[in-house]
Amino acid sequence: MRGKLIFLFGIDGSGKSTMLEMLKNSKLKNTIYTSCMKNAIFEEELYKAEAILHFSRSEVFSHEFKHVLHIGSVIYNMYDKIIPVLNNGKNVILDRYTICIKQFTDLFLKPSYNCLSKALDCLPTPDLGIYLDVEIETAVKRIEQRSIKTGIPPHYSESKKALIMKQTTYETQIPNEAYPIVKIDANKCIDEVYLSILNILNEVYATTL
């Protein structure tokens, strides 16, 4: 791949999606900002069937089945949309990547289903991961504020207990990843976190000139 593949990650409430939106307004050249996890093509088919046939997926299908669809959608989105962009020489900054899916698999699915995430090994190794390190209490407050603003209650995987589990898992995973990961303090105000990320990206881009 001629372009750089970089991704932001952290527990819920760390600000990764907010940072990606702010980066879209930055002046970084030759860069695409997106997510390989949204617009999940195969999951959307399930949601359409649910609406048309009037059933609840949680009553018919397991978490594991939905996760298979999610992994398939991520792989499809990467090969269909993102890898071609990288091959054309553009840099791509993602909101989350494979380490996040593997973490969810380890924490919330039956142990016998951990093998499912091995399908993600077909995806390219990123050039850099940027970990937004945030305190649990700060993350909980941000999630609560978002819920009040949107009217959407937090997902079960966003509970305080789940956040602690996710943070612990990330700290275990990070040293074992086969690519560089930079950790930044995401407890600071949004503008400071944004500037920290922007400085890191400018340094990465400078080394490729």
What is the predicted function of each stretch?
Residues I11:
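P-loop (Walker A) phosphate-binding loop of NTP-binding proteins
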Residues S14:
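ATP-binding Walker
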Residues V140-L209:
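NTP-dependent small-molecule kinase module
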Residues S17:
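Walker A/P-loop
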Residues M37-N114:
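ATP-dependent small-molecule kinase phosphotransfer cores
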Residues L8:
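Hydrophobic anchor at the beta1->P-loop junction of P-loop NTPases
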